[in-house]
């Protein structure tokens, strides 16, 4: 997360759930306020994503649960429907390409605002200098993958309808704080927010509000005065399970599990997967073919993948295999996977479509694991798609999930686990 030290106007604590006022002088409302006939103020979402992250190199586009990190917040911002424009400010070509793939516009960040010492405020001011049409900036942190559109919708309403100059996200925590011991200065610690003689139970204490770094919304005139927080300001309290911030490597596996359970996966409701189609060469196998002395072909697969297929079938998901190559019957029978298989397929999409209709399924109920250009159309068409880590670049660009495992090295088992987690989300949403 970019430094924010320059961007806050100091103010005293506010009562719980109440707005607080910052130090800047009384601010003029943005043009058009209170005039129903004038064009509403331009609210722009801005994600700052420079390429020089020190904690995790290029972390903004590192895959989290199969999706580039920045993709989670871009999806939420675009689907919120409250922004006139959604931008990514970056100095890196790869980040720019990913941002455009998700539908965001790109502001090329200057070298001056891409330094380790540069602050978020520096980059936002630069963005505003190039975009006079923008009246309000919603600075969304790329490192907060559990952000939901509903959070952004409510904050936009607070800014537009309730007249706040700035709104920032917080999370409620129940943590007791103690002063730091410093040799030669303070030899003992002191409680900062509790009486040790009367330690409250969690349920008897409201806790405290902490910034969680997910977003900072502010009006243009406030930012131009040098503040991200000030004027008539308020906090927006996010749910604890949605308050995820990734800074170092140790945060990554925790965030991955959290986003799979609590992340936002798009507007369309998840469907229960009923059919998984898997390409044989490069997905089930590693793509290598060995030929014995008697001219028989030999292929291998990972036992973990066989177990993954078995678990899918036990959960009621049909698993079928497909290949454009003419695999021999002896080779297929030797796999002992008991899956319907189609080989020498010139049009994989037509074959999968035929299977789908045969089972009475919609495309959203079909999953596909592929790795080649010939799989591209299937990957784009199905409800859930994935590729192994070593898939070709065109296949990778067509999917929503890229496995950590390579083909023939556990990719099917990994994708199966991903499917099970999504099915859990489907079941939970149905219960709600």
Swiss-Prot record:
One Pfam family recorded for the sequence: CTP_transf_3
Motif BC2 motif: positions: 198-204
Pathway annotation: Amino-sugar metabolism; N-acetylneuraminate metabolism
Biased composition (Basic residues): 18-29
N-acetylmethionine modification, residue list: 1
Tissue: Liver.
Residue ranges of the motif BC1 motif: 15-31
Catalytic activity reported: an N-acylneuraminate + CTP = a CMP-N-acyl-beta-neuraminate + diphosphate
One Gene Ontology molecular-function label: N-acylneuraminate cytidylyltransferase activity
Cellular component aspect of the GO annotation: nucleoplasm
Annotated keywords: Acetylation, Methylation, Nucleotidyltransferase, Nucleus, Transferase
E.C. no: 2.7.7.43
UniProt modified residues of type Omega-N-methylarginine: 35, 50
Active site per database record: 199
Chain positions covered by the region annotation Disordered: 1-38
GO biological process, one term: glycosylation
Binding site for substrate: 50, 60, 109, 118, 120, 141
Signal peptide: none
Motif interval(s): BC3 motif: 267-274
Free-text comment about domains: The BC2 (basic cluster 2) motif is necessary and sufficient for the nuclear localization and contains the catalytic active site. The localization in the nucleus is however not required for the enzyme activity.
UniProt similarity note: Belongs to the CMP-NeuNAc synthase family.
Protein task: Catalyzes the activation of N-acetylneuraminic acid (NeuNAc) to cytidine 5'-monophosphate N-acetylneuraminic acid (CMP-NeuNAc), a substrate required for the addition of sialic acid. Has some activity toward NeuNAc, N-glycolylneuraminic acid (Neu5Gc) or 2-keto-3-deoxy-D-glycero-D-galacto-nononic acid (KDN).
Quaternary structure note: Homotetramer; the active enzyme is formed by a dimer of dimers.
UniProt protein name: N-acylneuraminate cytidylyltransferase
């Amino acid at each position: 997360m970019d430094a924010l030290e320059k961007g806050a106007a100091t103010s005293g604590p506010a009562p719980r759930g109440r707005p607080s006022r910052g130090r800047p002088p009384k601010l003029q409302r943005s043009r058009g306020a209170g005039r129903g006939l004038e064009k509403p103020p331009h609210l722009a979402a801005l994600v700052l994503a420079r390429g020089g992250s020190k904690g995790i190199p290029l972390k903004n586009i590192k895959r989290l649960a199969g999706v580039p990190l920045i993709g989670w917040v871009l999806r939420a911002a675009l689907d919120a429907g409250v922004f006139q424009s959604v931008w990514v400010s970056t100095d890196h070509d790869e980040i720019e390409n990913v941002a455009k793939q998700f539908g965001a516009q790109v502001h090329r960040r200057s070298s001056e605002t891409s330094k380790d010492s540069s602050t978020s405020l520096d980059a936002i001011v630069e963005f505003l200098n190039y975009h006079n049409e923008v009246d309000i900036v919603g600075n969304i942190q790329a490192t907060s993958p559990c952000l939901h559109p509903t959070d952004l919708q409510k904050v936009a309403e607070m800014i537009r309808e309730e007249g706040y100059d700035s709104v920032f996200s917080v999370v409620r925590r129940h943590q007791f704080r103690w002063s730091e011991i410093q040799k030669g200065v303070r030899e003992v610690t002191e409680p900062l927010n509790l009486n040790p003689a009367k330690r409250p139970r969690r349920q008897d204490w409201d806790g405290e509000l902490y910034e969680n770094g997910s977003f900072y919304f502010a009006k243009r005139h406030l930012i131009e005065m040098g503040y991200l927080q000030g004027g008539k300001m308020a906090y927006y309290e996010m749910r604890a399970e949605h308050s995820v911030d990734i800074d170092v490597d140790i945060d990554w596996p925790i965030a991955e599990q959290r986003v799979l359970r609590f992340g936002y996966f798009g507007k369309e409701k998840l469907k229960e997967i009923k059919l998984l189609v898997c390409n044989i060469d490069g997905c089930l196998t590693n793509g290598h073919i060995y030929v014995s002395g008697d001219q028989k072909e030999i292929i291998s697969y990972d036992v973990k993948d066989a177990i993954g297929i078995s678990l899918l079938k036990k959960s009621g998901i049909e698993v079928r295999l497909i290949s454009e190559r003419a695999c021999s019957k002896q080779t297929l029978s030797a796999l002992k996977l008991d899956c319907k298989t189609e080989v020498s397929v010139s049009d994989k999409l037509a074959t999968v479509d035929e299977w789908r209709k045969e089972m009475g399924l919609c495309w959203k109920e079909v999953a596909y694991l592929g790795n080649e250009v010939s799989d591209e159309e299937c990957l784009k068409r199905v409800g859930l798609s994935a590729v192994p880590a070593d898939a070709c670049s065109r296949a990778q660009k067509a999917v929503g999930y890229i496995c950590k495992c390579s083909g023939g090295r556990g990719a099917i088992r990994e994708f199966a686990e991903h499917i099970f987690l999504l099915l859990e989300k489907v079941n939970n949403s149905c219960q709600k």
